[in-house]
Amino acid sequence: MKKVRITAVRKASYPDLMALYENPMENACSVEEGAVFIANGWEKPEGLCDSAWQSMSAFVLTLACGGEDIYSGWMKNRHSAMISCNDGFRPVSFLLEAMEEEAEL
C-alpha cells in the first residue's frame, strides 16, 4: 500500500450564498491553498478536516492500493484524482497523488 499526497490547490468562497443561507460560523475552514497532507495508506492525515476526508477517503484508498485511471481517462496522471470537499459555501479542491513511498502500517 502506498502513501498518497493530498494538496489543496484551490479554495473558493461564495459570500452571496453564505449571506442567504448560512448561519455565521466561528471556525470555518482553515485549509490554505498549497497545504500538503500525506495519507499513510487509509489513515486520515493529521490536520485535514473530517468533512474533506469523508469526500476523498475512497479515492485515497483506491490510489493507495494501486488503483489507477479513475473514471477512465479523467486525469492526465493515471495515479491521481481531483476531489473537492463537501462545503458548498467555501469548497476546497484537492489534488490526490499516489506516491512511490510505501505506507507505514
Model-derived features: where do they sit?
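Short, charged beta-turn/beta-strand-edge "cap" motif at the junction between a beta-strand
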Residues: 12-13, 41-47
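Short, compact, well-ordered microdomains
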Residues: 56-105
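Short, flexible N-terminal segments of the mature chain
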Residues: 19-44
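A structural detector for beta-sheet-dominated domains
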Residues: 7-9, 40, 97-99
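Helix-coil modules at protein/domain termini and other flexible surface or pore-lining loops
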Residues: 4, 29, 83-86
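Intrinsic-disorder/low-complexity, polar/charged segments enriched in Ser/Thr/Lys/Arg/Asp/Glu/Gln
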Residues: 3, 36-38, 91-93
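Short, structured beta-strand/loop micro-motifs enriched in basic residues and often containing a Trp
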Residues: 2, 8, 13-22
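A short, structured loop/turn motif at beta-sheet edges
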Residues: 1-3, 30-33, 100-101
